[in-house]
């Protein structure tokens, strides 16, 4: 009788506990969902939207330009084509890599700051 009670209690205990594999699977799914949900928020904090407050005479995105200081925006650059005979256009250099995009934004901002000094002269 005691053996029967021990077996029943063991069986009930084993059934009541979820398996370790099921817990790990659920935990991995939740962790993946959390990471997917957090990625856009991280990107939004790291690279806020570029809000351009333009001075009269500055060119909007897509307009033809010759120098970076002509374009409206902190990181807007005059993107030139491979041949120098064609004029460039105002825009933002982009890359699909988040880190690379941050580096481009930083480099373009510094470049625009320096070119603004030379354009003013």
Swiss-Prot record:
Cleavable signal peptide: 1-16
Any GO MF annotation of the entry: ion channel regulator activity
Main location: secreted
Gene Ontology CC terms: extracellular region
UniProt note on tissues of expression: Expressed by the venom gland.
Subcellular location: Secreted
Any coiled-coil regions, as ranges: none
Disulfide feature: 54-72, 65-78, 69-119, 71-90
Keywords (A to Z) from UniProt: Disulfide bond, Ion channel impairing toxin, Knottin, Secreted, Signal, Toxin
Family, per entry: Belongs to the neurotoxin 03 (Tx2) family. 03 subfamily.
Domain notes: The presence of a 'disulfide through disulfide knot' structurally defines this protein as a knottin.
Function of the protein: Ion channel inhibitor.
Name the UniProt record assigns to this protein: U15-barytoxin-Tl1b
Organism from which the protein derives: Trittame loki
Organism taxonomic ancestry: Eukaryota, Metazoa, Ecdysozoa, Arthropoda, Chelicerata
């Amino acid at each position: 009788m005691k053996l029967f009670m021990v077996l029943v209690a063991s069986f009930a205990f084993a059934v009541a506990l979820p398996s370790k594999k099921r817990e790990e699977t659920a935990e991995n799914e939740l962790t993946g969902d959390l990471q997917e949900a957090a990625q856009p928020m991280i990107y939004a904090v790291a690279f806020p939207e570029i809000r351009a407050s333009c001075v009269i005479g500055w060119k909007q995105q897509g307009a033809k330009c010759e120098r970076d200081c002509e374009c409206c925006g902190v990181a807007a650059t005059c993107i030139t084509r491979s041949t120098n005979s064609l004029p460039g256009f105002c825009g933002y250099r982009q890359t699909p890599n988040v880190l690379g995009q941050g580096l481009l934004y930083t480099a373009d901002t510094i470049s625009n700051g320096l070119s603004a000094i030379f354009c003013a002269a």
